[in-house]
Amino acid sequence: MEHLDVGPLKTARGTIKLPGSKSISNRVLLLAALAQGETVVRDLLDSDDTRVMLDALGKLGVSVEGQGENAYRVTGTGGRFPNTSADLFMGNAGTAIRPLTAALALQGGEYTLHGVPRMHERPIGDLVDGLRQVGARIDYTGNEGYPPLAIHAAPVKIDAPIRVRGDVSSQFLTALLMALPLVESAGNVTIEVVGELISKPYIEITLNLMARFGVQVARDGWSSFTVPTGVAYTAPGEIFVEGDASSASYFLAAGALGGGPVRVEGVGMSSIQGDVRFADALNRMGANVMAGGNWIEVRGAERDDGKLHAVELDCNHIPDAAMTLAVAALFADGTTTLTNIASWRVKETDRLSAMATELRKLGAEVEEGADYIRVTPPSQWTPPAGGIDTYDDHRMAMAFSLAAFGPVPVRINDPRCVAKTFPEYFTAFGGITA
């Protein structure tokens, strides 16, 4: 197996220009494809997941022209894809398969969607149930509740609120929100969220971007959303993709652990991404944090031993960046508890189980619950036997690069899995650490 040896590291300092946000990139591509008019998308993330969306849109007949320097000109279809049948490979891109499933279910065509084996283990049943409430015909061609999917032409009828669970993945709600304006009947449709909505900041991203394309959604708290139907998305002409706030978290944490200063450019206080609030969590742990509209800078904790403060933190608002906190907890002065992270279990891997397993390899004491993880730093660090396994999960690989600030070298297995969102991550990380 390919591996990369990192550390032990002592210092981190420098400036990083972040790649585009995955969550924003794939939402913007789909909205631009569905809109009326042309959109030039700038600073699009170049990664496996965005290529999955670009390939799918091409197979659906959408004109997408590369302009160089991660810019693309998307010619909108006015809500109807030219191709009424397609076989689409979705890789392991949840941000592609879920919104596309909803959009295609309302197109009146015949489509199949499938992916890598892990994608076929990631739940989609709650979204399918929601779409069936408006008459969509969707069949499971493998296990019930999971991809692969076969979507068939069917008349869509909305005569009651749509109910969807919010406690498994916010992407189900995002998919419905983005697709329902395509329904041709004039009026509004209400989505009622059943249970506690997780990952609320990702819904805020969705609503913000829909508004940029001319569709306003009204919400009653986080339990009810009213979506206009029979309206067209309107191309904004040009849109810039923010830097990826989840990816920023690794460099900001490096600044806290390696003294800093480390500055990230591309996200800041004006960001629409929830994971930008990772900087607040670092501040609570004692790191020195400064920020502007489009940048954040972190220096180490101002205490003699350089350790961070242990914290107890509800991470509903930073589900992806919370993984970075779990590794940073190795360097705290006590036990850190991260709660409200049940969504970790249905991501690229079961991240709760994977995180607990790999932290223990380094000597940490870890308690893993249904929706929480409790990390006590190692009393004696141990080199991870066999290396840190990454489970084909980009965020596992990036988060555990930070463990190299400990007293033992860290071997990262399958480091190329970072290509899902940040192909050049280890080059960038190596450029600011020593």
Swiss-Prot record:
Domain of life: Bacteria
Membrane-spanning intervals of the chain: none
GO cellular component term of the entry, any: cytoplasm
Annotated compartments: Cytoplasm
SUPFAM superfamilies the record matches: EPT/RTPC-like
Enzyme class: transferase
E.C. number: 2.5.1.19
Enzyme active site: 320
Pfam family of the protein (one): EPSP_synthase
One Gene Ontology biological process: aromatic amino acid family biosynthetic process
Disulfide bridges in this chain: none
Residues binding 3-phosphoshikimate, per UniProt: 22-23, 27, 169-171, 199, 320, 347
Catalytic activity of the protein: 3-phosphoshikimate + phosphoenolpyruvate = 5-O-(1-carboxyvinyl)-3-phosphoshikimate + phosphate
UniProt keyword annotations, A-Z: Amino-acid biosynthesis, Aromatic amino acid biosynthesis, Cytoplasm, Transferase
Pathway: Metabolic intermediate biosynthesis; chorismate biosynthesis; chorismate from D-erythrose 4-phosphate and phosphoenolpyruvate: step 6/7
The protein's assembly and partners: Monomer.
Entry's family note: Belongs to the EPSP synthase family.
Function: Catalyzes the transfer of the enolpyruvyl moiety of phosphoenolpyruvate (PEP) to the 5-hydroxyl of shikimate-3-phosphate (S3P) to produce enolpyruvyl shikimate-3-phosphate and inorganic phosphate.
Protein name: 3-phosphoshikimate 1-carboxyvinyltransferase
Organism: Ralstonia pickettii (strain 12J)
Gene responsible for this protein: aroA
